[in-house]
Every structure is written in C-alpha cells, then in structure tokens.
Amino acid sequence: MEEKYGGDVLAGPGGGGGLGPVDVPSARLTKYIVLLCFTKFLKAVGLFESYDLLKAVHIVQFIFILKLGTAFFMVLFQKPFSSGKTITKHQWIKIFKHAVAGCIISLLWFFGLTLCGPLRTLLLFEHSDIVVISLLSVLFTSSGGGPAKTRGAAFFIIAVICLLLFDNDDLMAKMAEHPEGHHDSALTHMLYTAIAFLGVADHKGGVLLLVLALCCKVGFHTASRKLSVDVGGAKRLQALSHLVSVLLLCPWVIVLSVTTESKVESWFSLIMPFATVIFFVMILDFYVDSICSVKMEVSKCARYGSFPIFISALLFGNFWTHPITDQLRAMNKAAHQESTEHVLSGGVVVSAIFFILSANILSSPSKRGQKGTLIGYSPEGTPLYNFMGDAFQHSSQSIPRFIKESLKQILEESDSRQIFYFLCLNLLFTFVELFYGVLTNSLGLISDGFHMLFDCSALVMGLFAALMSRWKATRIFSYGYGRIEILSGFINGLFLIVIAFFVFMESVARLIDPPELDTHMLTPVSVGGLIVNLIGICAFSHAHSHAHGASQGSCHSSDHSHSHHMHGHSDHGHGHSHGSAGGGMNANMRGVFLHVLADTLGSIGVIVSTVLIEQFGWFIADPLCSLFIAILIFLSVVPLIKDACQVLLLRLPPEYEKELHIALEKIQKIEGLISYRDPHFWRHSASIVAGTIHIQVTSDVLEQRIVQQVTGILKDAGVNNLTIQVEKEAYFQHMSGLSTGFHDVLAMTKQMESMKYCKDGTYIM
C-alpha cells in the first residue's frame, strides 16, 4: 500500500494537481535556488555589458545580433522544424505577430537601457509577471489580495517615485543637447522627440519608458501562453519567434549599414562580448527560468530570483569598470563618456530597497483565511473559528474604490468636509505659486510654494484623523479610533513647535546681520496667501473657541445598565453606561486651526516687513517680525500640547473635577452602600468621558437599584462611558479564603477615610 500510494500521488503534470501544489522538500530545492541566483547574477553582468556595447552599436543592429545568436542556438538544439506537429498557416501568422511584438518590446527595453543605464534598467524591468499582475490587481480590482498586497503595491509605486524625483542621475542632466550619435537614425530621433514632448529629462523619460515596457512584457507573456500550447511548447515558440525576428530585422540592418557610418572599427573584437550577452541574457536566463518554474512554485521562483538580481545591480553599479568602453575608447572611434555616468545615488538605493520589499510581498501567495483560532462550538456541534486579521481583511479593496469611499465619508461630516475644502484651496494656491515661480524663475515663489506644500501635509494628517475617528470599533481596537484626533493634534502641535524653534533661531541670526531682500514678488504672494489663510481662519475658528468653551457644557447620553451575579464565593454586579457627550476638546481641529493661524501670522509678518523695507529700508524688520511670529506660534501651541498630553496620559478632565467630587460624595450617601474603591475617570476622546468604580454594598441590598443610582449620579457629572463593579460580603469571604483577612480587605476598600480634598474640590488619593 505504501508503494502504491506513496510519492506525489496528488501531483499532476509538472508537479501540481487539482488538489493543490505539493510542497517539495527544501533540500531538493536548494540546487535550483542556487542555480537561479547564479543565473540572475550572470544576467546582471550581461546587461552591464549590453550598455557598453550600445555606445558603439546601433540599437537595431544590437537587437538583430542578439536575435540572430539566440535563434541559431535554439533552432540548433530545439529542432523546431523536425520535432513536433506541423505548423499551420494560421499559426505562422500568430508567430509573425509574436515576433513583431517581441521586437518592439526589445526596442523599448534596450532604448530605456541607453537612457537610464544598466542599474536602473535592472531595478525597473527585471520583475516577474506574477509581481506585475499582483500590482495591477491591487490597483484596478476590488479583490487585490488583502492589506499585504496593497502594502507591496505601495512599495512598488514609492520605488518608482524615488527614481523619478530623488535620483540625481547627472549624465543626462548635464547634456543640454544630445550628441549627434544619438540621432544617427530616424528611429532614435523619434524616440527622443517623444520623450522631449513629455517635458522631462532623458533619464526620467527612460524610467517611464521602462515601466511601459515592463507592462507590455507582462501582457506579451500572458497572451503568448495559448500560442505556446498550440505550437508545441514555449521553447519551440521562442525558437521560431527569434528566427522570424531575424528575418524581419535583416532588411532594416542592411539599410542602416549602407546609410550610416559604423563606430566599430573591428566587429571581430566584439564577438566575445556579444556571445556573453547572448548566452547570459537571452539563453541561460530563459532555460533556467523554465526549469525552476517547473521544479518550484512560480511565486517562489519570482521571489528567489528578484533579490539576487537587484543586489547584483547595486554591486555592479558601484564597482563596474566598463571594460568594453575602455576597449572601444582605445579604438578612438567611440564617443568618450565619463566613468561616473549613471552612478549610485541615495534615491537609487532607497528605490532598490522598496523594489526588493515589493517583489517579496507581491510574489508571496495570499494567505487570507488560512489560519484561525478555535473559539467554541455551535449548538449543532460545528466548530467555530476566529480568523486572525479579519479586522483588517474586510477593509481591503482597490485603490480607486478606497478613494471613492473615503471621499464619500469625508464629505458626510462637517469637520472633515471643511478640512478637505481648505486643503483643495491650499493645494490650488500652492501649485499656482510653484508654476508661476518656475515660469518667472523666482526662487522666493518656489520656496514659499514648497513651504505651503509642507503645511498641506498637516492638513492631510488632520483630514485622515477626522476620517479615522469615525471608523467602527473592531476586535483589536475595541474602543474605536476616537483618540486618533487627540494624537493628530499632539503631532501637529509638535510640528508647530519645531517650526517656531527654527524660525526663532534663524531670526536671531538675521538680527545680528540683517540680509538684503528682494521684495519684488513678496507682496502679491503674501497677500494671496493671507486671503487663503483668512478663509481657513473663518472655517476653523469655531474649533478653537469650541475647545475652550463647549467642554463645560452638560453631557447628554442614552445609557443602559445591567447586573451580573457571580456564583461561588462572590456576588458581583456590573453596570455600563454608554453615550455621546455634547462637546469636548477636539485637538485635531485645534491643531489644524493653529497651523492656519501660523500661516496667517507669517503672511501678515511678510506684508508688514515688506512695507517697512520698501518705505524706510529697515531690513531688520524682517527678522523682528519673524521673531515675534515664532514667539506667538509657540505660545499659542503650548495649551494644545498640554491638553493633548493630559488626555493621552489619562488625566482626570480638569473641567469635571468639582462635579466628580460632588458625585462621589452623593454615592457615599446612597442607602445600602458601604463604600467604594478604585474610582478612575478619564477623557477617551472629544465626546467620551470614561470611568470605572468598585462599590461595596450590604448583603441584603438589590444590586440593580444601586447600579442605577450610581450610574445616574456619575452621568449627571459628565461620565458617559461607565463600568461599575458591585461587591458584597461573599466577595470578602472569598478573598479571606485566598489568605487575605476579612478586616484587611474591608480596611483596604474604605478609602473615603484616607482621601484628602482640596478647597477647590480636587481630590487626591
């Protein structure tokens, strides 16, 4: 029986079956993983050599030689004409289309290589199909695979943005005009013109071009699967496709050879470099990927293949010596390039890290709903499981749908709606300022635009805090997300303190040596900023005044209470009161208001200092106004920081101290109540004041009556989320059985005798 049913009984062709993939022991996979990593290392070597070759060889000639060498090898070993079924005319047409598409993708790939260099090309283009498909699934479908896949997609997008915005690739930036060698054919001239039309630098256009080529490659591979099955396998299809590509490119190469001057003095000297590129990039990588895809899962193959090629790219980007370039330079016919071209930068390193993280996450199989905890059984005997992470899984959705739902929630509530409208107005003014600054080459406008962009980040944080505060409570966050507004206000306050500190230090430095200022564009910019900020002041002023006045108002809530009788040695009751208060400190709105107020003061200070400088030449007015503004910002934000810290540290709300003192005195006088202990009261959010208390009652009293009276007294004092524990004599007897004396327990609970009161009603334990 063991021999009959042992082995891969569940495995189908290729190691998989209808019942799911069978895990291969890791020891058997080690050799394939090592082979895959070594192959990716060699492919990185081939791409770096390809970049050097493309400096001397026309891109069409380069692709033709690669296709020719690959076709020769694959036709020789695969024998596509003598093995397998006969190719029909309809299939030959499809193979022709396949070859055309392959040539176009190769053209985009290698032209992107000439623009970005091999390091950035490897980071952008060498992603597995499963990674790109997972990325597109997250972005454009509602079943993207959960929060992990969404996080991986975000990492991928951040990596591309790092290459676009934070990569100081100086080679192309230094070239005001392209060398004539780049325009030696209509094809390259057309591609450069298309990139110039986008209005971006060449290496940034190369990044966009490689992203486009990557998407085309994935679509090309997906569309080729059915054709590979029809013609007898992927290897046979590749052999025929490369052969057709050679025939397609041959006339073009002949025309180029006749009409253009070759930069290569001796083609014989390039045989070994081309052979290396053909074998490492085209042949070895294809065959090893095919073998590893069969022996391992596709996701594992993608995950184990991405890390070594990205690390190899970083290493070669720093240590590659361009041997072929030196050889061509010795011939005195290749264009001289600096050895520092396409070097490593901080943006590239950060981008590589994010690419590695995204490839690892996006290539991992989705594990939604695979692990759960047994929590009990149904009345019918069915086991019930609680699946970990379900609090987060249900909210996973596509990004467009998430944005749509978020906008809907933002516009439903007054606070978030006001922040959103002011954020849009602020962003509009910011981009107008940046656009006009670039148009007029005004550094002052550009710097002020980026300053306002920084202020917008505070508005975005306040907006998301207002949105998250309305999220429903989950199993993990059982109290909900109401306190996120307090945290947002605290962080905004810290930002303002940092801003005030740096403005203060810069103002002191300028007081000693006042610089001369160009006030040409300061007045219109400051007036425009003042108008925008005054609109924000009017919109958010209610939050500031409400935070100081409305918290004294009474609380209105609907409550419910219940008692729970414990069995055995104790008899407990628990009462709960839940409701929503009528007002409180909204630290989030106060933080947003103070940010707008700081910008308003800044605009006023700039206007005043500009007038004094233009009319009287008082350059010292600028640092004096800035110093005054920094002090005002600091003084206005200190109360916000203080209040937010008190809430985060669970301090008794100061506005309720006297009411709670009176309420505890009333509780002590309730008939049948002996004493109370452990009274704890704190503000949870702007609308919730929570509390817990233990009360000791006589054995003959009705617990629910006591709970109702205590709940009513504390609700009138402002506590709208209350938990009461009722303790009877049986509880103390139970504690006595646990080696604690009855009189000791009773003395422990009578805290009223040891409680000290201040004259203002504040009590101290």
UniProtKB/Swiss-Prot annotation:
Changing D599A: Loss of zinc transporter activity. No effect on localization to the trans-Golgi network. GO terms for biological process: cobalt ion transport; GPI anchor biosynthetic process; insulin processing; intracellular zinc ion homeostasis; response to zinc ion; zinc ion import across plasma membrane; zinc ion import into Golgi lumen; zinc ion import into organelle. Changing H451D: No effect on zinc ion transmembrane transporter activity. No effect on zinc ion import into Golgi. Loss of specificity for zinc ions as it can also transport cadmium ions. It comes from the Eukaryota. Induction: Expression is regulated by zinc. Up-regulated by endoplasmic reticulum stress. The chain crosses the membrane at residues 33-53, 57-77, 99-119, 121-141, 153-173, 194-214, 239-259, 268-288, 304-324, 343-363, 419-439, 449-469, 484-504, 521-541, 593-613, 618-638. Could homodimerize through the formation of dityrosine bonds upon oxidative stress. Residues 1-32, 78-98, 142-152, 215-238, 289-303, 364-418, 470-483, 542-592, 639-765 are cytoplasmic. Residues 420-640 are annotated as: Mediates homodimerization with SLC30A6. Together with SLC30A6 forms a functional proton-coupled zinc ion antiporter mediating zinc entry into the lumen of organelles along the secretory pathway. By contributing to zinc ion homeostasis within the early secretory pathway, regulates the activation and folding of enzymes like alkaline phosphatases and enzymes involved in phosphatidylinositol glycan anchor biosynthesis. Through the transport of zinc into secretory granules of pancreatic beta-cells, plays an important role in the storage and secretion of insulin. This is Proton-coupled zinc antiporter SLC30A5. It comes from Homo sapiens (Human).
